[in-house]
From Swiss-Prot:
<keyword id="KW-0546">Nucleotide metabolism</keyword>
<comment type="similarity">
    <text>Belongs to the dCTP deaminase family.</text>
</comment>
<feature type="binding site">
    <location>
        <begin position="135"/>
        <end position="137"/>
    </location>
    <ligand>
        <name>dCTP</name>
    </ligand>
</feature>
<dbReference type="InterPro" id="IPR011962">
    <property type="entry name" value="dCTP_deaminase"/>
</dbReference>
<feature type="binding site">
    <location>
        <position position="180"/>
    </location>
    <ligand>
        <name>dCTP</name>
    </ligand>
</feature>
<keyword id="KW-0378">Hydrolase</keyword>
<dbReference type="GO" id="GO:0006229">
    <property type="term" value="P:dUTP biosynthetic process"/>
</dbReference>
<dbReference type="Pfam" id="PF22769">
    <property type="entry name" value="DCD"/>
</dbReference>
<dbReference type="GO" id="GO:0006226">
    <property type="term" value="P:dUMP biosynthetic process"/>
</dbReference>
<feature type="binding site">
    <location>
        <position position="156"/>
    </location>
    <ligand>
        <name>dCTP</name>
    </ligand>
</feature>
<feature type="binding site">
    <location>
        <begin position="111"/>
        <end position="116"/>
    </location>
    <ligand>
        <name>dCTP</name>
    </ligand>
</feature>
<feature type="active site" description="Proton donor/acceptor">
    <location>
        <position position="137"/>
    </location>
</feature>
<dbReference type="InterPro" id="IPR036157">
    <property type="entry name" value="dUTPase-like_sf"/>
</dbReference>
<dbReference type="GO" id="GO:0015949">
    <property type="term" value="P:nucleobase-containing small molecule interconversion"/>
</dbReference>
<protein>
    <recommendedName>
        <fullName>dCTP deaminase</fullName>
        <ecNumber>3.5.4.13</ecNumber>
    </recommendedName>
</protein>
<dbReference type="GO" id="GO:0000166">
    <property type="term" value="F:nucleotide binding"/>
</dbReference>
<feature type="binding site">
    <location>
        <position position="170"/>
    </location>
    <ligand>
        <name>dCTP</name>
    </ligand>
</feature>
Length: 188
């Protein structure tokens, strides 16, 4: 497997719709204000967080069960910022919609700006031929409330191309998160 460059990312986004909307360069300012950067980097793509958040609360549940997850465990927030309670987490989604090629596996890593503040971003790999908005999980590992900014960079996608096309893609096996839009809760 080889990691793909900015040239490849740009070509795949512009000619094949791999990332929509797509930013061909790095954006570091909104007007006069400095922001957490997003867009194409040397060997990756920095994604933005949309303004839709689901903030975890334990008001309605006594246990978290991925097989029987209670949607009431979240409070929905639509805002330019999300305040995550201490030692809690929130879900969000990318602004960008992805269409992953059949020969590519995409890995998501959190941006150091957030990691250095104790805010961890977790996303599972984007498998070959998966498409949709990426659901992002932000963990606040600190004893203080933590802030996430919508429409700014939150994580970096790395694209790895295999030497051989997979026999069965995510689309082929009818993956449960195929085509997801918005923030998507756990499914079994």
């Amino acid at each position: 497997m080889s990691i793909k460059s900015d040239r490849w990312i740009r070509r795949m986004a512009e000619q094949h719709g791999m990332i929509e909307p797509f930013e061909p360069g790095q954006v570091r300012h909104a007007g006069e204000e400095r922001i957490v950067s997003y867009g194409t980097s040397s060997y990756g793509y920095d994604v933005r967080c949309a303004d839709e958040f689901k903030i975890f609360t334990n008001i309605n549940s006594s246990i978290v069960d991925p097989k029987a997850f209670d949607a009431r465990s979240f409070v929905d927030v639509k805002s330019d910022v999300c305040i995550i309670p201490p030692n809690s987490f929130a879900l969000a989604r990318t602004v960008e919609y992805f269409r992953i090629p059949r020969s590519v596996l995409t890995i998501c890593l959190g941006k150091s700006t957030y990691a250095r503040c104790g805010i961890i971003v977790n996303v599972t790999p984007l498998e070959p031929e998966w498409e949709g908005h990426v659901t992002l999980e932000f963990s606040n590992t600190t004893p203080l409330p933590a802030k996430i900014y919508a429409n700014e960079g939150v994580a970096q996608m790395l694209f790895l191309e295999s030497d051989e096309v997979c026999e069965t893609s995510y689309k082929d096996r009818g993956g449960k998160y195929q085509g997801q839009v918005g923030v998507t809760l756990p499914k079994t």
